[in-house]
A protein has these predicted regions:
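Catalytic domains of lipid- and phosphate-ester/thioester hydrolases
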Residues: 2-941
């Protein structure tokens, strides 16, 4: 498309170009954010730029942040967006940053811009009356994200069970592969023992001294003990070896070797003479310890000298020794780790043998394990609810620890069962023979090992299985049809997609189903490649979709990101990406993904990797019960060849909650709220001068935990200090020049939580890099109830006391509920206009706001929750200790993704919705069940 002049309208020739297409020769570099902003501003009418005081360059960035919070966030944010269109400032925003639920409506907004000819058309449609096709679609289909009705539920259940069985089949094959190695070791050890006893009957006595229950693998433990002894001896010998001369070291070492040989000779001679004397076992144990210590010394001295030669020689001698000592300590830890693994695997091997040959009903045990998984998924909400009702933080922590342990135990139990199956078929072939023979078990083992190994080798590169077997595709498809489909004119009858498209008004008689493409059907042009998605080309904002790059390990010592366990990844419309505070770079052209995929990833709240909330046991639990909404993505350019065992590595990473992160070839991505839920982080990183934030995370107690997280990360990562404001005193001279009534709804953060308050919008000053003389401004629009609300919202509040902080698990929005959140967002957002924003940044003491030293997020008493009209506010609960504020954020893990995963888990129960007579009762039951599941996942550490 030819670039229009600021004052020109599209010509008839330009109308021939399909909306969303563009002339690539005039497209600025996607990795140059400021070039994108300049090009965006140039697309606006000159009158728009003049009215909004928009500079021609890329300075004075304005950003709109839409936070996570599921369908509630999407609906409330839609109201805020329409309010900004009402006040005429929507087209002032250069950047649109979204997380999770905010991305639903943000993606729809971006698609409206890509299909429009001018940004002013979109703003006019959003500000107009509710007779546009896209608004009709959202109202009609906003609840489609969650299955409803018998047919829809059975469809979701089929997907869930198919994926769950596929995952367990892969895990079973992996367990069998490991089991083949273990059973092969057992067979080899038994074969060697039989041969040794045949050649020398004395071995029979030695083997008979071993306990019958001893796992074969534990025979390797003495080697580990010897290795650990040698490392310890080397550690204590380091200082002496470093200081002594070479001759002295050799002399002492030779003396130690001679003493060892003499002691061994003495034991052989003396043992034959007094072998039958009392305390024989004690004497042998003492001699064994002495032998071990001397052997450790003999081997430890050379090891100490070798390690001293390995470390760098720079620095003092003491530093040289300290470096060698640190290296030996690491080796000792590795030795202990391997010994622990041998102990654990040996114990599992013994348990597998017990299940195979000592349990009466072996198959019933496996079936019971499957039932246990289903029961565990069903009872987890009740366990979490019980711990939460106790009101004690320790109870929640104990529950989290218990669930983490249960996850590990479930993995071990699953592997053990598959090993017991292998024991049954392999050693059963040996014991079923009338005469002891090695051929049958070897043949059976080979018959299992060859196809298992062949399958792993042939399918190991199929890393796409990881995403296909998760719930991501199900979630993405519904999200695309529900929200991105609202901007697709092809879904609406009689609408020309080359003209107004979804911005067109409905016929006078209202929307008609005739010719309408149902939300259950796939329709072309719903989604778009991220590189082709460019709302900025039509004057819309550059859309930043934020996700979390999970990272629990690091090659630099495995301590980096110890608390966060994740990095922010922002993906910009046009095909650019940014990890943390690094420079922008292009998305890989062959793996840029689509807008719908990125928005779905941004809302993947329940996954084995959940940023700071990642725990190994919980990752195991999520994998085993099929709660997998995360996404594996390769950022490599040029399409590097897939790893031979990419699928295996990814599945093990999910099972153990271990992710390589930034430096790994494949990245595990999840909900952007797992790092930062308000979506303002990316705007602060871009040094935006004005940020309007729709803070919609679940916060029934108005504790502002998402805000606390933003304040802390902005200070640490971005050198941006967020200072909340309050209105100046009524006696301040500034009110002689400003209308106090116009600022009645602006105030301190605490005032948002007050039961009776006129304040409904909070303001913060942002100081970048310590430049307090040139601050930026953050305007927080948070769902709350203030005195000036319209009558219908106050009445809805009376009937629904939890409004507007109802659980994000509630995705069954009724008409009144949808309209209430939408209207609330529109009411609160209308207080943000150009005049107020300009007044905030006025110099010379003319700003109506001043620093509020009492509004320190995370370091003050939690305000009293908002009460119903006519009811007294509940007493404010005691503020949690500072340490607890670093815990799990309830708001982050409770998004629509959770509901999608949880709903399929209770799908049989949801089928009751089909009974028309119980329609309303069933809907209420759905809300209760999903609320409990959401509470459980939200409490996970």
């Amino acid at each position: 498309m030819m670039k229009m002049s600021p004052t020109a309208r599209a010509t008839p020739d330009e109308h021939l170009i399909a909306p969303g297409k563009r002339d690539m020769s005039h497209t600025p570099d996607a990795t140059d954010l400021h070039a994108q902003v300049r090009a965006r501003r140039a697309q606006l009418d000159a009158s728009t730029r003049h009215a909004l005081n928009i500079p021609e360059d890329s300075s004075e960035l304005w950003g709109l942040a839409l936070s996570g919070g599921g369908i509630r966030s999407a609906t409330f944010s839609l109201g805020v967006i329409r309010a900004l269109a009402d006040t005429g400032v929507l087209n002032r925003f250069d950047l649109l940053s979204t997380v999770s639920g905010g991305g639903y409506i943000g993606g729809m907004l971006g698609r409206l811009f890509t299909r429009a000819h001018r940004a002013e058309e979109v703003a006019a449609a959003l500000a107009g009356v509710d007779t546009r096709w896209f608004l009709w679609w959202l109202r009609a289909n906003g609840r489609y994200l969650v299955p409803r009705g018998m047919t829809d539920t059975l469809f979701a259940l089929a997907i869930y069970l198919r994926n769950l069985l596929a995952i367990h089949l892969e895990l079973g094959i992996m367990a069998l592969c490991l089991g083949c190695l273990l059973v092969g070791l057992d067979l080899g050890t038994w074969w060697w023992a039989q041969g040794a006893a045949t050649r020398d009957p004395g071995w029979i006595t030695s083997f008979g001294a071993l306990p019958a229950w001893l796992p074969t693998l534990w025979l390797l433990l003495p080697l580990g003990v010897v290795a650990a002894t040698v490392i310890v001896a080397a550690h204590w010998a380091l200082t002496w070896v470093a200081r002594a001369s070479l001759g002295k070291v050799l002399a002492h070492w030779a003396g130690g070797l001679l003493l060892t040989l003499l002691l061994l000779g003495y034991q052989l001679v003396a043992g034959g003479v007094i072998d039958d004397s009392p305390a024989r076992d004690t004497r042998r144990a003492l001699w064994l310890v002495m032998d071990l210590l001397l052997l450790g010394w003999v081997l430890g001295v050379p090891m100490a000298a070798w390690r001293l030669r390995q470390v760098p020689t720079e620095g003092s001698a003491a530093l040289h020794v300290e470096a060698a000592r640190s290296l030996l300590t690491q080796r000792l830890a590795t030795c202990f780790k391997w010994m622990a693994a041998v102990l654990l695997v040996g114990l599992m091997d013994r348990a597998a043998w017990f299940l195979a040959f000592e349990v009466q009903d072996w198959l019933a045990t496996g079936m019971a394990a499957g039932v246990a998984i289903a029961v565990l998924r069903a009872v987890l909400p009740s366990v979490s609810k019980a711990s939460a009702s106790g009101g004690a933080e320790g109870a929640e922590g104990l529950t989290g620890m218990a669930l983490n342990l249960i996850g590990y135990l479930m993995v071990l139990a699953l592997i053990t069962w598959w090993w017991s199956l292998l024991h049954k078929v392999v050693f059963g072939a040996m014991f079923d023979q009338q005469q002891w023979s090695w051929s049958p078990p070897v043949l059976v083992l080979a018959g299992v090992a060859l196809p298992v190994l062949g399958y792993l080798l042939l399918t190991g590169r199929n890393a796409s299985f990881l995403n296909l077997s998760s719930l991501h595709a199900f979630y993405r498809a519904r999200l695309v049809r529900t929200y991105l489909g609202a901007a697709n004119a092809r879904r609406f009858p009689g609408v020309n997609h080359d003209e107004q498209g979804a911005l067109a008004t409905l016929p006078a008689q209202g929307g008609s189903a005739a010719g309408l493409v149902a939300v259950t059907r796939v329709e072309r042009d719903d989604d778009i490649d991220m590189g082709q998605y460019r709302p900025q080309d039509r004057g819309g904002p550059v859309h930043l979709v934020n996700v979390c790059l999970n990272q629990t390990q690091d090659p630099r010592g495995q301590i980096y990101n110890l608390d966060r366990k994740g990095l922010p990844l922002s993906v910009a419309s046009g095909g650019a990406m940014r990890v943390g505070t690094e420079d922008w770079r292009a998305l890989p052209p062959d793996n840029a993904l689509t807008l719908g995929t990125w928005v779905a990833i941004s809302g993947a709240a329940v996954a084995p990797g959940m940023g700071a909330m990642t725990r190994g046991g919980m990752a195991s639990l999520a994998t085993l019960i099929g709660a997998r909404l995360g996404y594996w993505w390769s950022p490599a350019e040029g399409g590097e060849a897939a790893s031979r065992f990419g699928k295996l590595r990814g599945l093990v990473s999910e099972l153990m909650g271990s992710f390589g992160g930034r430096d790994a070839p494949d990245w595990f991505l999840s909900d952007g709220g797992h790092f930062e839920n308000t979506a303002a982080y990316a705007l602060l990183a871009a040094r935006a001068r004005v940020i309007v934030m729709a803070d919609c995370g679940a916060d029934p107690g108005f504790e502002f935990k998402d805000m606390e997280n933003l304040v802390r990360k902005a200070r640490i990562d971005l050198q941006a200090e967020i200072l909340f404001q309050r209105k100046k005193d009524a006696s301040d001279p500034v009110w002689g020049q400003l209308d106090a009534e116009a600022w009645a709804q602006f105030g301190a953060l605490d005032e948002l939580a007050a039961a009776q308050s006129d304040v409904c919008v909070a303001v913060a000053k942002v100081v970048y890099d310590g430049r307090s003389e040139d601050p930026a401004w953050l305007i927080v629009v948070k769902p709350n109830v203030c005195n000036a609300l319209p009558v219908d919202l106050r009445n809805y509040k009376r009937a629904n006391p939890d409004f507007p902080q109802q659980s994000t698990a509630d995705q069954f929005f009724s008409e009144s509920q949808w309209e209430s959140y939408h209207s609330l967002g529109r009411f609160l957002g209308k207080h943000v206009d150009l005049q107020r924003v300009q007044a905030l940044s006025a110099s010379g003491g003319l700003s109506p706001m001043v620093d509020d030293e009492e509004s320190v997020v995370g370091e003050r008493d939690v305000p009293a929750p908002q009460a119903r009209d006519g009811a007294a506010a509940a007493p404010a609960p005691a503020a949690p200790p500072a340490s607890s504020l670093r815990g799990t954020r309830a708001a982050i893990a409770s998004t629509i993704s959770l509901s999608a995963a949880a709903t399929v888990g209770v799908s049989a129960w949801q089928g009751m919705e089909g009974w028309r007579a119980a329609q309303q009762a069933t809907t209420d039951a759905h809300r209760v069940a999903l609320g409990e599941l959401s509470t459980m996942w939200a409490k996970l550490p």
